[in-house]
């Protein structure tokens, strides 16, 4: 009887511990979702990149002491929040321009966001492995490395979705001095590194440890980045005339015979009116008819462009293997 009661007490305690662990993870995942919603404020038009850096710092505190599986879920819910706010324009495109009802549009967005969030989950899963590989350096470089690796994979896998590249948020800011050298992906590493250093500074303060090395590292990075901004990394090699054209057609008009004819006329007229050597740009998929189905027009504008030594840049619907 005593043994049975003892085992029963142990079982109850285990259930109680499991309950509190589940409750704690639920709270952490909810906070991660909120962090994801706030992270997108770093991108245009808000440009609150400082908020985004602090959000990652908060996320690192949420990640403290978590196992790989829990980090996967934490990253997933962070990604869910980030993508829900970061690609809200897709809902506008699907609902208002694609004429899909509210329920259908919302369903498509949720499915898309759910898939994209896996990338953020993988980021934190990789972070867990890198952090354990080298505990001293991992606290600073594990998350930046994991973030950049997964961003690069996301930009290329399955034709890629290079949207919300974190490093782009500090463009034209006080700390974008390294951009000409390291590019957007390098900037991603840079801002996540800043967040990691801030996390370590706060952690040291909480443990009553003076964070002089971390604070000095942070100040040096910011100062060097600002100094690099003063350097002219490029020089002007010449000038080129550019004309940018937007057909301004509704979706229905664009895919109609009327829209095709109007777009072709605009392209032809823009080439005729362009200066010699000019760059003529029609953004996105201006021509919604394949080259094989439109050979006469394509050959005509190619000839005209060659005669005027100009370049035409546009998108076109293409079909392969019939």
Where are these regions (language model features)?
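Active-site phosphate/pyrophosphate- and oxyanion-stabilizing loops and adjacent acidic/basic residues
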Residues: 1, 176, 302
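Soluble catalytic regions of membrane-associated enzymes that act on cell-envelope
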Residues: 228-322
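Active-site flanking residues adjacent to catalytic metal/cofactor-binding acidic residues
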Residues: 1, 150, 283
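A generic fold-level signal
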Residues: 2-5, 45, 158, 237, ...
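Intrinsically disordered, low-complexity serine/threonine-rich segments
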Residues: 7-9, 18-23
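Single conserved hydrophobic/aromatic residue that forms the stacking wall/gate
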Residues: 1-14
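Intrinsic disorder/low-complexity segments
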Residues: 12-13, 18, 278
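Membrane-embedded alpha-helical bundles of multi-pass enzymes
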Residues: 20-230
């Amino acid at each position: 009887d005593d043994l049975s009661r003892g085992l029963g007490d142990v079982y109850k305690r285990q259930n109680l511990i499991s309950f509190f662990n589940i409750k704690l993870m639920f709270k952490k995942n909810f906070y991660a979702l909120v962090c994801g919603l706030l992270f997108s404020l770093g991108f245009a038009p808000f440009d609150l990149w400082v908020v985004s850096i602090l959000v990652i710092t908060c996320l690192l505190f949420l990640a403290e002491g978590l196992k790989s599986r829990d980090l996967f879920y934490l990253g997933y819910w962070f990604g869910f929040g980030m993508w829900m706010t970061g690609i809200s324009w897709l809902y506008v495109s699907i609902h208002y321009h694609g004429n899909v009802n509210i329920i259908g549009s919302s369903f498509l967005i949720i499915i898309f966001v759910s898939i994209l969030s896996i990338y953020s989950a993988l980021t934190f899963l990789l972070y867990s492995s890198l952090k354990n590989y080298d505990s001293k350096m991992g606290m600073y470089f594990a998350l930046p490395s994991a973030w950049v690796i997964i961003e690069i994979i996301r930009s290329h896998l399955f034709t890629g979705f290079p949207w919300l590249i974190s490093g782009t948020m500090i463009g034209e800011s006080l700390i974008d001095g390294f951009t000409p050298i390291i590019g957007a992906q390098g900037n991603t590493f840079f801002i996540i590194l800043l967040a990691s250093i801030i996390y370590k500074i706060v952690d040291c303060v909480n443990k009553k440890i003076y964070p002089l090395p971390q604070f000095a590292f942070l100040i040096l990075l910011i100062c060097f980045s600002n100094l690099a901004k003063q350097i002219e990394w490029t020089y002007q090699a010449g000038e080129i005339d550019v004309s940018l054209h937007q057909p301004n057609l509704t979706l229905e008009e664009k895919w109609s015979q009327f829209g095709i004819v109007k777009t072709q006329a605009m392209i032809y007229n823009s080439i005729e009116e362009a200066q010699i050597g000019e760059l003529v740009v029609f953004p996105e998929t201006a021509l919604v008819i394949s080259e094989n189905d439109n050979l006469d027009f394509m050959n005509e504008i190619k000839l005209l462009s060659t005669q005027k030594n100009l370049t035409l840049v546009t998108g076109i619907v293409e079909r392969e293997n019939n």
